[in-house]
Amino acid sequence: MPKKCRHLLQTSDLSLDEIKLLLKKASVYANDFNAVSLETKEKMQNKIIVALFFENSTRTVSSFEIASLRLGAKIVKLNMQTSSASKGETLTDTFKNIYAMQPDAIITRHAFSSAPFKLAEFSQCPLINAGSGVSAHPTQALLDLLTLYQHFGSLENLKGKKIAFIGDVKNSRVANSNIKLLQRLGLEIMLCAPSSMLPSVSLKTTHNIEEAIEFADILMSLRTQTERHNAPIFASLKDYGNAYCITQKRLEAHAKNKEIIILHPGPVHRDIDIESAVLEDKRSKVLEQVKNGVAMRMAVLEFLLLD
């Protein structure tokens, strides 16, 4: 019987102590990507990781590649547009064939929310969910938490802080994973979106971005996921931006007397999700999130493959 391995399919797969461990390790790597011990590099140098992405990605796939290489592992990224999946091979058969080659870990992204949970049934190597439908994106939530942890100084300081998610919350796996994780850590949450972009949850909601800004210590803007909409919700993205863009004017009017930070998981629609001037503002932590993506994914890979 092979040794049972750990998967990371959703943030609830991790205990609070394990989350603290990941934050500690990722903080070291965020300060210095080269702070990988010789012991870790020696153990990782023969590890082979496969990235199996059935949806497009820039930040996630690149940061997993860089994280793997910085740890000393080898990574194979499959181009699913030129794979046998384009010839009609099923997801399960594609996965089983890759798994038969005995990689040490598989990172997967798929449009179906259930995909990683189904694939985990066939895997005795660590499986990492890099985004599944609208349900989960655990490493994004962890890197966002790392960004908040760095800014506020500790998990204890995060308790009671208020975060507003602004945008297409209903179709955002990032929001879904973040909400579940941040609720565990004692943050207050508000969702801000038009009715058609709000999920059915027992959380504070508003259709008014000004109310969200006044409520929050942290704003997380989300892009409109038009690829998941059955019909247009606004006449144009510009019309959406007029109602929900985080602008200097709105921040000046509704967050003038408090410290507030702004996050976005990317890709950002400039001047639709967040005004360009705000993205360049010191309150924007968007590029810190990107950097922290490498650090946190280094910590996750080390945790799953070596611990």
UniProtKB/Swiss-Prot annotation:
Signal peptide start and end residues: none
Pfam families, per the entry: OTCace, OTCace_N
Pathway the protein takes part in: Pyrimidine metabolism; UMP biosynthesis via de novo pathway; (S)-dihydroorotate from bicarbonate: step 2/3
Chain residues that bind carbamoyl phosphate: 59-60, 109, 137, 140, 266-267
Keyword field: Pyrimidine biosynthesis, Transferase
UniProt GO molecular function: amino acid binding; aspartate carbamoyltransferase activity
Reactions mediated catalytically: carbamoyl phosphate + L-aspartate = N-carbamoyl-L-aspartate + phosphate + H(+)
One GO biological process term: 'de novo' pyrimidine nucleobase biosynthetic process
EC number: 2.1.3.2
This protein's record includes keyword Transferase: yes
One GO CC term, this protein: cytosol
Positions annotated to bind L-aspartate: 87, 173, 223
Stored InterPro entries: Asp/Orn_carbamoyltranf_P-bd, Asp/Orn_carbamoylTrfase, Asp/Orn_carbamoylTrfase_sf, Asp_carbamoyltransf, Asp_carbamoyltransf_Asp/Orn-bd
PROSITE patterns, per the entry: CARBAMOYLTRANSFERASE
Function: Catalyzes the condensation of carbamoyl phosphate and aspartate to form carbamoyl aspartate and inorganic phosphate, the committed step in the de novo pyrimidine nucleotide biosynthesis pathway.
Subunit structure and binding partners: Heterododecamer (2C3:3R2) of six catalytic PyrB chains organized as two trimers (C3), and six regulatory PyrI chains organized as three dimers (R2).
Family: Belongs to the aspartate/ornithine carbamoyltransferase superfamily. ATCase family.
Protein name: Aspartate carbamoyltransferase catalytic subunit
Lineage: Bacteria, Pseudomonadati, Campylobacterota, Epsilonproteobacteria, Campylobacterales
Gene of this entry: pyrB
